[in-house]
Structures are given as C-alpha cells and as structure tokens.
Amino acid sequence: MNEISPAIASTLADRIYAVQNPMLVDIFLKLPYFMAANKSGASPNKHLKAEVGGRVVLNVKDGFGVCAYGGKGYEDEIFLIFRGTTTANRKADILTDARIGITSNSAGLPVHTGFHHCFTSMLPDIKRFFDEHKGNIKVVHCLGHSLGGAVASLAADWVARTHKHPTKLYTFGSPRVGTDWFANSTTSALRKENMHRVYHRTDPVPMVPLYPFMHAPYHGEGHYIYSAQPLSSGVAHKMANYSESVKKKTWEQLCDVPEQPYNIERAIEGWLKSKSPVDSSSAAFWRWIDSALIYVLKKIAMVAIMSLQAVFIGAFTLADKIAYILAKGIDLAEKVSIWVELLMRKIMQALGMKVANNKKELTKTLIRQVLVRLTEKANHEAQNALKKL
C-alpha cells in the first residue's frame, strides 16, 4: 500500500492551516501531490468547512480541511487533510476541544463529543466527494495536527468502515479521540501498521482527555519523539517543531521508546508505592498517572465484576463515573482498596492538595473533587499549548 513519508505528511499538516483563507486554499491545492484543475478551471478537489465551537456559544462555520485527489505519482489516491486548532476564529476551536463528553459515532462506538460534531458537520461534503470519485481508489490518506489529527482519526475510521478502501492515518500531537472500545475497533479497521501517531514527550495535548479516552493504535506507543521543552511552554506542540523532528527520517526511524516502563504492571505498582515527590508540571507524571488510573480501575472492575466501558455510557459526568468506581474500590478488600488509596495520594500530592491520611477520608465526594482538579489541570496545560499556536 502506498505511504507518504514523515516529511511530506508534516508539510501537509503544517500548510493546511492556510485553509481558513479561500485564496490560500487554492495555493495549497497547487502542491504537486494533488491533481491540478482542468483546462476549464474546474478542480477535482473540495474545500471543507466545519462547525466549531460550543453547541450555542461561538458556534461558527470555518474553513477546516480539504478533500483532494492525488496528482502525478499519487494517481487514484485520496487525501483528507484537516487543520489544527487556531485562535483566528475567536477561539471557537478551543471550545470544540473542551467539549469532552462522550457520544456515539455511526458505528455506535464512544467518541469525544466535540471532535465528533466537528467531523460530522463536514461529512455530507466528504460523502459527495467520494461519490464523485468512485473509481479505482488505491489508498486514502487522512492526516492532521492537533485538533486536525483528532478529526483525521475519525475520518480514517469512517473511510475504512464505510468504503473499505485501504486507509492510512498520520497525526501529529493529536489528543485522544475515543474510549477503549473505539481505540480497539479502529485499530482493527485500519490495522496498526497503517496508523502513524507522532507525539513529543513534553507535548501536553496528546495527554488529554484523560481516561476513559485512549489512543489508537490499541496497545501501541505510536511514534514517540523525545523533547526537552517544559510542558507548560507549549513549544513541543507546535507543528513547526514536529516538522523539524521528522525531517529526513523514515517511519521506521521514528521508533523511540518512552524511557519509563509506563505500561508494565510491576512498574506501575512501584511508582504508586514510591515515596518520591510528584510534580504535575512533569510530562512523566501524566504518563504515570494515566497508566496508574487505568490499572486501578481495571483491578476494581475485575473484583467487582463490572464492565468499565459500559459504566462510562450515560448522563453523569466522567468525573462522577470514575469517582463512583474508585469509591466502590475503597470498600473492597485491602488488596484492591490499597491501590485506590495510593493513587489518590499521588494525585493529591501532585496537585498541592492536603493528602488524605487514610482511606476513610476518601469519600466519593472528595474523590470526585480530586478528579475534577486533575482534569482541570490537564486541560489547562493542553489549552495553554493550543493558545500559543
């Protein structure tokens, strides 16, 4: 299956930000990767506009991406390219990022409400584009940076499921898009080797939303790239820095492994038991806390015989649902409740809160308060990075 290089993918993900200006869109579509307009001036490519913002507040229609037919060397290939977050539309994109509820996509899988709304607002135009190009499509390339990466993930999943075309996904600094069910299902639909998730170590955006949202490919690290910039600076999220990190490299060369064994159970237990201080401004803390939260919730679910993913479907907030599960864990046997206690102590310490002395103090109300503070802190770091784009 044809595959574009990291350098080309990063160039397209960077230059697509011009999509908000109709004149610059025409210049973008003159890149050699796309089919040119015919002699009469008619272009086979389509400029996409999406609804971004809140459901009522700052709900605007804005240039968001393109559907493009491949040019020389890319014949019979389709490109779906989406821009990332920008503040040029009165920060409506930030509201899209902040709509962190769960909704179901067309396959009934749980995904991020804001990202799903943004994608489905463009879907009629995307469907028309595919109807106009029903020929022998060799491959569909879906790509984007930041918010654009999240939307590209939903687009790639839709293409693979609906049209069964070979599909490639390329994302840079993308946030999490769906829950465990979606991550597992979309990995099966696209296949792990066709999913290129690139992220910097200190980019805060791929760290959100917190669990139950998870990255795809399922059980895959993606293309991890070391970065030393402070988490709070937002510098590691800039597309220009991603372009610099991947230039002159192949996908196989972008295979660094995170320096800590975040997904090994014994290592997670060791981190939870450790007396070493934790700092919410550290990228390592967010990796550890994400793995530890999943580890503890799954321990509770196994003993209490509950489906974690089923719990997250419903009207209550995610903080309410996770607090419910953790509070249930406090009441279970010591071999389970101790992990809830250690987890909450770690989070409270990192957030500068008064640490609970014992598990009796860890009421459902307090647990919820801690989780809300944790979520607010994670979202603040991500939104700070987005505002600096």
Positions of PLM-derived features:
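Serine hydrolase/lipase
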Residues: 76-77, 124-139, 157-389
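Short, hydrophobic/amphipathic alpha-helical packing segments
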Residues: 123, 152-153
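Structured loops at beta-to-helix junctions and adjacent beta-edge loops in soluble globular domains
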Residues: 15, 70, 83, 200-201
